[in-house]
Every structure is written in C-alpha cells, then in structure tokens.
Amino acid sequence: MSSRDGLHWKRWGEAFLRPGPEPERWVNRNNMIAWGMLVTKSALPGAPDEISLYSSEGYYQKDCRMRRFTLRMDGFVSIHADAAGGEMVTRPLRFDGRELVINFSTSAAGSIRVEVQDETGNAIEGFSLDDCPEIYGDEVDRTVQWKQGSTLEEVGGKPVRLRFVMKDADLYSIRFR
C-alpha cells in the first residue's frame, strides 16, 4: 500500500512477499508480518541503513520461527523503467529547499536524468535533460546535479514539473533539502 496524504491508500494486487518454495509457508498464517518495522544497520560495511520486517514461518510446525526480510529505505514502491526506457513527469509542484535528492537503483547499463520544467512543461534553462549528466548506481541519498551544479534556489517556491527519463532503473523516492 502507499499513500500520498496518509488518508487515501492504494493497494496493489501483487504479492509483496512471496511464500517461496517451502510448502509450509503456503498455508494459514504463514508469511504474516509481525507488528512493526525496524530501521536496522546493513550487514554490508558502509551501506545505508535498511528496513527490517519479520514474518511467521512454519506457523503450525513444532519449529515455528520468524524470518527477517530487508528492504532499502523507502523501498516499498518504485517507478520502474525497463531497458527500453520510460519517462515520468510530475504534476506542477512547489518546494522548499536548495537540492533535489533521489533514492534510486539502476543496472550497469541503466540511468536516470532529470529535467526541471516550468508549469507548462518547458525545460527551464540550465535544468534541461542535456544539462543533467546520466545518474547511475544504487543510492538512497543522491543529490541531482546539472552542469551548473545542484542548487535549485532560482526555482524554489515557484510551480515546476520534474521530468525523469529512465532506462533500466527504479526511482523509489524524491525529496528536496
């Protein structure tokens, strides 16, 4: 589920956690998520924190146990583009802050570029796709850069659209700081 306002929710029909190959996980009350989620340290040195979820496994068995699943921060839902590519354009929005920060993941051949547009959809000078070098990798806190740098001060507080052009990539979240 996800919500843009905390009041209205969208639920997807696809499984979030699949039962896996063990037959015992396909029956009543298995894969039931335990109450709450935790922010935990990654097992990889230097990697960002992650979200841990726990679910029941083998509920009716003598050796009933909890299984830990991990997600990247804000990794519940993403805008996805396959290798053929895709685009997403936001509705006009106003923001406070000086920089755009994205949480994303690409393949080695994938990328994301960001264009800042006026409210009618025209690229703002200095913030076009041509001004944004390809972004690739796997980060939860990457500041978007354009040729002139990362500052968005000149468009802050004004209605703008953000255009994301993506290839073999997932965009999990955006924020301004």
Map each language-model feature to its residues.
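Carbohydrate-active catalytic/glycan-binding domains of CAZyme proteins
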Residues: M1-R177
